Amino acid sequence: MSKAKEKKEVTTNQGKKHLFGSSEKSDFILNMSAESAQKLCGVYSIIAVLVLCVITIPYYFTQNIKYGMDESVNRTLYLNEKFIFFISAAVLAVGFVGFIIFLIANMKKQVELKDNKSLIVPLAVVLLSVVSCLLSADIFTSFYGYLDRSEGMLTILGYWGLFAAGMTVTADDRRIKLSDFIVGIGAFEAIVGILQAIPATAKIVPNYFKEIFSAFSSGGMTYTKEYIATGFLCTPFALAAVLTVISAFALNGMLYDDKKARKIFYAISLALMTAADILACVVPAILGLGAVYVISLIIAAVKSGFAKDKKPFIACLVAFIVAGGIFAGLFAS
């Protein structure tokens, strides 16, 4: 090897750390650039959101597939009952990896634990779930979760990791891409929910919630078949919660983003999510969506007071009036 080449290799590796004295190839995490670290955080966050979106789809399409009988209570067992435990395990795995991503970002000084006090909030929820699990009548169900709820202690622990992973996305371009993807997921769930609420398409799009009490019909209980939006989130309450959060992304993106194409995308997505929230027919959807519009309207009013551009305030006011009119019309009917 020539002296020039040898000198070049020494210069390349100079000052770089290695895990356990290993080679450079095995410790890319320590040696990755700030841009590469942000790419890792951003890409993982998008993958995590995608996994959470599609993970319940098999649960929907296996709800009528029988695989056995529970002789002790003479109850038919369905394949979707098995998926609940896989869903909880998958959420935990995604959350665990998310927390590792957070630790990597902390190592790379992309995010500091001392500067992210908001992580205490989901941690408090985790601690409360531990107490709830220990005091529950059925610790097994409280730990793993069960049908139509699935939020056992393991699942909530996974959520904490997802919050931590989301905090690592600090670069503006990565945040915009993640926001675009989240709004796209919200629009997808909204479209599914709208199709579930239309009688003509409800037969094609599966909706577990509308059949949830059908087994009791023959036993004397009154069962009314309704067309209620749930998306692929099992219940209208879950759909309302998810769409409320994502609507905040869409509304403020529509108001303040500089690119016209993205404004249009956010506006269409917001309209779809508003419609799905209305068709969910639950009070949390109305309260949540109303809070999004009111808070965004206040922010737009404050910002417009210090700026010449009044368009965000006017757009938010129009959206608020239209949504309020739709809600009022539904209640009046």
Regions found by a protein language model. Give the residues of each.
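Membrane-interface coil-to-helix junctions
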Residues: 69-86, 120, 125, 151, ...
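Asp/Glu-centered strand-loop micro-motifs enriched in Gly/Pro and often flanked by an aromatic residue
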Residues: 29-35, 74-82, 108-115, 166
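N-terminal hydrophobic segments of proteins, predominantly signal-anchor/transmembrane helices
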Residues: 47-68, 93-160
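Alpha-helical transmembrane segments of multi-pass inner-membrane proteins
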Residues: 3-8, 15-22, 33-54, 88-102, ...
